[in-house]
Amino acid sequence: MYKLVLIRHGESTWNLENRFTGWTDVELTPTGVSQAQQAGRLLKEGGYEFDIAYTSVLKRAIWTLWHALDQMDRTWLPVAHSWRLNERHYGALQGLNKGDMAKQYGDAQVLIWRRSYDTPPPALEADDPRGQRQDVRYAKLDAEQVPLTECLKDTVARVLPFWNDSIAPAILSGKRVLIAAHGNSIRAMVKYLDGISDADIVNLNIPNGVPLVYELDADLKPIRSYYLGDAEAVAKAAAAVANQGKA
């Protein structure tokens, strides 16, 4: 049996302000730092050990991973960064308040933008300063690989090659893997692992800063999965994520 641990980054400044974040590179709040540290403590108390960690190229996930590893006294672990683990790109919604958008367009439309599988938000213009095509961290990518908007289907399409080429081989080689990423890049992996339908994925919400453990069989099929920590607190945190897009 293999184990895989996924952690969504701790609360960010734009989570706190209820803004669509996407590829915008924002900081953790003090609460987010505490959540990341608590994740590390839970992993240490549970006796978890890791051989390699993966994260995105966005600092809210990078710092979450670092704070968790610091609590485990494992900051020396090798870490692989990939843009493929970035949050879903929210296009022209990036930086806008979710509640304000719900008041303007209705809760149902914002839910579609936030959670539907194949409906992307309105795209950014290519020269919009909120975009990332001039960002040095993406300089080696083709322009079309740096999105102007994404739906979850698009996110799955970029996450799965990294899973298949890097993460899955590491697990199968016996390495114990920790991934710190984002709500939608984790939803993409969970959808794939659990075989969640396109329709049902709308109901999946990933809480900030809570370790999600997968026990996998020899074919990397889930035996079971569970969050570490207090079940009631985890459920409340997931419900809070679900309510972010309401007026």
From Swiss-Prot:
SMART domains: PGAM. Keywords: Gluconeogenesis, Glycolysis, Isomerase. GO terms for biological process: gluconeogenesis; glycolytic process. Its EC number is 5.4.2.11. InterPro entries: His_Pase_superF_clade-1 (IPR013078), His_PPase_superfam (IPR029033), PG/BPGM_mutase_AS (IPR001345), Phosphogly_mut1 (IPR005952). The keyword Mitochondrion does not apply. GO terms for molecular function: phosphoglycerate mutase activity. Pathway: Carbohydrate degradation; glycolysis; pyruvate from D-glyceraldehyde 3-phosphate: step 3/5. Signal peptide: none annotated. The record marks H182 as: Transition state stabilizer. Substrate binds at residues 8-15, 21-22, 60, 87-90, 98, 114-115, 183-184. It comes from the Bacteria. It catalyses: (2R)-2-phosphoglycerate = (2R)-3-phosphoglycerate. The keyword Isomerase applies. Pfam families: His_Phos_1. The active site is at H9 (tele-phosphohistidine intermediate), E87 (proton donor/acceptor). Gene3D superfamilies: Phosphoglycerate mutase-like. Homodimer. Belongs to the phosphoglycerate mutase family. BPG-dependent PGAM subfamily. Catalyzes the interconversion of 2-phosphoglycerate and 3-phosphoglycerate. HAMAP family: PGAM_GpmA. This is 2,3-bisphosphoglycerate-dependent phosphoglycerate mutase. The lineage of its organism: Bacteria, Pseudomonadati, Pseudomonadota, Betaproteobacteria, Burkholderiales.
